[in-house]
Design a protein with these regions (language model features):
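Hydrophobic alpha-helical transmembrane segments in multi-pass membrane proteins
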Residues: 11, 61, 66-203
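Membrane-interface helix/helix-cap signal primarily in integral membrane proteins
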Residues: 1-80
């Protein structure tokens, strides 16, 4: 039960714990510090609940969202929007790929001699990798990254991107890395929705 709940160990304190500050060092600490700095900059620039929501969308820092705003998002069924997942990953990848292809289209002679689609796909892959890292890499974010990256890698190797085979590869990787996710509604709904979209595209 603990494994499926994501609990690796439990314990207790003999006395009241004293918070002395973060002591983590290395790359993970540098990434977390960068996330917090970006979130603080967004809050200072926008301010209010809007700034907190923007910070959640950009770097996945949701702790500062006021309870009133969170409750309003829940009542309207929009709370999932601030959880970085497939929608956000697709927007990042689509924006970068579209921008790269638009820029390369300005140089038709050069574009005719180079694999523009592969360059754009690679740029999109780099962009969503950076977004995964800076957003904290939660479960839904990692799953969305995996599905998108499989499709982009397929483009790099001149394969069809939107196929059930690529979706199956993504599912197999998820099952190998985190098998307990298969029983969760998030995994089931995201893969079911993606399968429906891929099937509709093929039809």
């Amino acid at each position: 039960e603990g494994y499926f709940d994501g609990i690796g160990a439990t314990g207790f304190f003999l006395g009241k714990p004293e918070v002395t500050g973060a002591t983590q060092e290395g790359l993970s600490a540098a990434i977390e510090n960068a996330r917090q700095r970006i979130a603080a900059r967004i809050r200072d620039t926008i301010g209010g609940a809007e700034g907190e929501i923007a910070a959640a969308l950009m770097v996945g820092v949701r702790a500062g969202i006021p309870e009133e705003a969170s409750e309003a998002l829940r009542r309207t069924g929009l709370y999932h929007v601030i959880s970085i997942s497939g929608l956000h990953m697709a927007l990042v990848a689509g924006t970068v790929i579209g921008a790269i292809r638009a820029v390369m289209a300005l140089f038709p002679m050069w574009a005719a001699r180079h694999p523009v689609r592969k360059y754009a796909a690679f740029a999109g892959l780099v962009a969503i990798t950076a977004y995964l890292v800076i957003s904290g890499g939660e479960v839904a974010t990692r799953r969305s990254f995996l599905m998108l990256s499989v499709m982009l890698v397929a483009l790099l190797f001149d394969r069809a991107a939107l196929t059930m085979r690529n979706l199956a590869i993504s599912a197999i990787v998820v099952l190998l890395v985190t098998p307990h996710e298969v029983v969760g509604p998030s995994f089931q709904m995201s893969f079911a929705a993606t399968a429906a979209l891929v099937g509709a595209f093929a039809w």
